[in-house]
């Protein structure tokens, strides 16, 4: 293993969307330290926390079109049958929804749950309730993606939270996606909902921790053995 690869395995990169925030915190630390030296160390700690928040680690993603991978780091806050948001145009029949809540200490880079092609992106303005509340799915600001997969269309909804006030989407309509590919980011606490068509069986339970790009949250068909994975 090369020295460069060794360093990469130890130091987790910061996503480019976090650069302005990390730089801002560091400059503020210098200014505060000039006024009162102990404040520099407080500012430096906040700078390191900001870099930690915007971390963008590589993940090992299973390459199986029958598996759905977690789109976010966080706690599974809901596994239930509900009607998908109207703006996704997924119909009015209940679909399996798996919800993942991200607190301010979780990695907030969002990933595609499955391989497919984006057929729709719909943004909706809304409130900024605690994203862990069930009603946040209906009332909060959100950005929804519809992905055409081998098993039909799935919906992936980025939901803003009490602190989060900015949803970022990195992809466009008609763009192909691999499972685990980065699709967006939500700043400072939020939630991801994934809607599955008939045939999907949940593979997680409420309260379970999920890792974006790695944890299997749903599966189509019968459970299988080990699968091939790739870095994402």
Curated annotation (Swiss-Prot):
The keyword Kinase does not apply. Keywords: Cell membrane, Decarboxylase, Lipid biosynthesis, Lipid metabolism, Lyase, Membrane, Phospholipid biosynthesis, Phospholipid metabolism, Pyruvate, Zymogen. It is found in: Cell membrane. It is a peripheral membrane protein. Binds 1 pyruvoyl group covalently per subunit. GO terms for cellular component: plasma membrane. Its cofactor is pyruvate. Heterodimer of a large membrane-associated beta subunit and a small pyruvoyl-containing alpha subunit. It is an enzyme of class 4 (lyase). It catalyses: a 1,2-diacyl-sn-glycero-3-phospho-L-serine + H(+) = a 1,2-diacyl-sn-glycero-3-phosphoethanolamine + CO2. Pathway: Phospholipid metabolism; phosphatidylethanolamine biosynthesis; phosphatidylethanolamine from CDP-diacylglycerol: step 2/2. Is synthesized initially as an inactive proenzyme. Formation of the active enzyme involves a self-maturation process in which the active site pyruvoyl group is generated from an internal serine residue via an autocatalytic post-translational modification. Two non-identical subunits are generated from the proenzyme in this reaction, and the pyruvate is formed at the N-terminus of the alpha chain, which is derived from the carboxyl end of the proenzyme. The lineage of its organism: Bacteria, Pseudomonadati, Pseudomonadota, Alphaproteobacteria, Hyphomicrobiales. Its EC number is 4.1.1.65. The modification Pyruvic acid (Ser) is found at residue 190. Catalyzes the formation of phosphatidylethanolamine (PtdEtn) from phosphatidylserine (PtdSer). GO terms for molecular function: phosphatidylserine decarboxylase activity. This is Phosphatidylserine decarboxylase proenzyme. The active site is at residue 190. Belongs to the phosphatidylserine decarboxylase family. PSD-A subfamily. The keyword Lyase applies. The record marks 189-190 as: Cleavage (non-hydrolytic). One of its GO terms (biological process) is phosphatidylethanolamine biosynthetic process.
């Amino acid at each position: 293993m090369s020295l460069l690869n060794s360093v990469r395995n130890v130091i987790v990169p910061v996503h480019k969307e976090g650069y302005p925030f990390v730089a801002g915190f560091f400059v503020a630390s210098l200014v505060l330290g000039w006024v009162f030296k102990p404040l520099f160390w407080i500012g430096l700690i906040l700078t390191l926390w900001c870099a930690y928040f915007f971390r963008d680690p590589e993940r090992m993603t299973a390459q199986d079109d029958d598996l759905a991978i977690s789109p976010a780091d966080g706690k599974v806050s809901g596994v239930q049958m509900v009607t998908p948001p109207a703006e996704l145009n997924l119909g009015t029949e209940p679909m399996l929804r798996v919800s993942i809540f991200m607190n301010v200490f979780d990695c907030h880079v969002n990933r595609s749950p499955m391989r497919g092609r984006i057929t729709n992106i719909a943004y909706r303005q809304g409130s900024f309730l605690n994203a862990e509340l069930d009603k946040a799915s209906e009332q909060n600001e959100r950005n929804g993606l519809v992905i055409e997969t081998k098993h039909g269309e799935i919906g992936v909804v980025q939901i803003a939270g009490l602190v989060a006030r900015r949803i970022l989407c990195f992809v466009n309509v008609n763009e192909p996606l691999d499972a685990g590919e980065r699709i967006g980011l939500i700043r400072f606490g939020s939630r991801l909902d994934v809607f599955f068509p008939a045939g999907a069986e949940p593979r997680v339970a409420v309260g379970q921790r999920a890792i974006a790009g790695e944890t299997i949250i749903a599966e189509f068909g019968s459970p299988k053995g080990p699968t091939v994975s790739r870095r994402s």
